[in-house]
Amino acid sequence: MVDYFDYNSLLTRAREQLPEEVFKDVRFEIPSADSFVEGNRTIIKNFKDIAKFMERDPQEFAKYVMKELGTAGDMEGVRLILQGKFGWRMVNEKIQNYVNEYVLCPECGKPDTKIVKEGRIHFLKCTACGAMKPVKTL
């Protein structure tokens, strides 16, 4: 039997037919928090926009940020109001920690994930590669 195509030429041909987005690594960049201190409170003006960008529930995301900062707070429209003075850098660091723990897939690094509950355990399930990782309940 004659082999008309060798493996490398088939692989090259298949890769050429894939869209450019598949090969890009910088497709997911979180918008930085637009925060300021007003009196003894810190206000994040674009909090709901950040949660929507990550495709996460704003209430659960707010709960995580408040827990990590060790403070109380409240959602007011699209803003999150935190009790206490927190710098821009600290707020963005907590947001990035949330992204690393609850948004990005640990296997492929893509943000195409959902938090699913199976039994009593919450999992981070990747829709891109199918990987599942147990995560802490908020």
UniProtKB/Swiss-Prot annotation:
Record SMART domains: eIF2B_5
InterPro entries, sorted: IF2/IF5 (IPR045196), TIF2_bsu_arc (IPR004458), Transl_init_fac_IF2/IF5_dom (IPR002735), Transl_init_fac_IF2/IF5_N (IPR016189), Transl_init_fac_IF2/IF5_Zn-bd (IPR016190)
Keyword field contains Transit peptide: no
GO molecular function: translation initiation factor activity
Keywords: Initiation factor, Protein biosynthesis
Family indicated by similarity: Belongs to the eIF-2-beta/eIF-5 family.
Subunit structure: Heterotrimer composed of an alpha, a beta and a gamma chain.
Function in brief: eIF-2 functions in the early steps of protein synthesis by forming a ternary complex with GTP and initiator tRNA.
Protein name: Translation initiation factor 2 subunit beta
Gene (name only): eif2b
